[in-house]
């Protein structure tokens, strides 16, 4: 299963210079796995882009509605917060901070990676430097393979 962090998922909804590369990654097949936290994180990201005038007025809510429809349609698979995800999140935090080169993982990033593990992901798509560094410690494949 491929888990999509919000930093990468947002590029599928808002045109950015590298959006096409992420669209190609998304077409590899299967539903894109996301965390239940992503449903809120993406709304914040969309509103932030609207505030910065990267989106037209009202664009954030229109895109968010499309995002919710994709969840309903099964294009996006939401990993719920469960005891399993909580346990994996604890493991993520401990492994990141005790690594030879520790990663100062933040709470929401740890919850995202705990969701990835709890959902059975073996790959993470992200542009976030901390999530990418943590995914490496956790032996998850990281996409895209070009640097950010």
Regions found by a protein language model. Give the residues of each.
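Acidic catalytic patch
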Residues: 72-100, 108-110
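Helix-adjacent hinge/juxtasegments
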Residues: 52-82
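Short, well-structured N-terminal submotif of metal-dependent ribonuclease cores
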Residues: 1-63, 129, 138-143
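An acidic intrinsically disordered interaction segment
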Residues: 1-14, 70-85
